Amino acid sequence: MRKYLAISVYLLGSIFMILTGMKIQAQKIHLHNKGYDVEYNALTAIADRVEYYLSPSDFQGHRKAKRKAFKVDRRTPAPRAKTSHYTNTGYQRGHLCPAADRSQDKTLYEETFLLSNVAPMSPALNLGAWKSTEDYTRHLSQVYRRVRVVVLVWHTESIAHRLPDSPIVIPYAFGKQVFTADTDSLLQEWFIYN
C-alpha cells in the first residue's frame, strides 16, 4: 500500500509541477536524525522533504522546553545555510519538523534547531496557516495514537529567488501529508503558498 501511495504522490506531484512549470532540483542528501529524517537539497540549501512519526507522548506531559538557537548542520555541503542569512530578510526560520513535537527529549528537541530542518517562511504563514497544520497534526496523533508526517517543500524552476547574499532558495509553497502509522492511510493533506 505504501509503495503505491508513494508512487501516486510522486506522479501527482510531477503532474502538478509540469502544469505549473515547477521543478524540484536534484543533488539530494539523506540526513538521518533521531527524531526525523531529511531529504536535503544541496542546490537550494534547504530540505525538499522531512518525515517523522508523531505520538501524543512526543508533546504531552512535558514542561515547555527552553527555546534553543538555530545551528548550522555540518553534514550539509558548503555553501551552508547560516542563521545570519535570515536576518532582516522578512522571512522567518520555519520548522519543518516542529520543535514542540520533540519536546519530550532534550536531544530530540535540540536537533529540530538544525538549519537543515528549517526553510524561509513568511511570518503570516509560519505563525498562521503553518502553525494550524502543526496543531491539527497533533490532534490527529491524539485521535489515531501515532501518525506519520511528510513535509514537502516546493520551489520554482528558477532557483534565483534566494535570501539576499545566501545559498538559500525561498520556497514557492509547502505541503504536509499526515498518514495513519499502522495502515498508512492518508488522513489529511495541505498545500500552502509561501
Write out the residue ranges for each language-model feature:
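Positively charged n-region of N-terminal signal peptides that target proteins for export
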Residues: 1-4
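Hydrophobic H-region at the start of alpha-helical membrane spans
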Residues: 6-10, 40
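Bacterial N-terminal signal peptides
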Residues: 9-18
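Boundary of Sec targeting at the N-terminus
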Residues: 22-27
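Short, His- and charge-rich active-site/binding loops that engage polyanionic ligands
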Residues: 29-92
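Domain-level detector of nuclease and nuclease-like folds
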Residues: 75-194
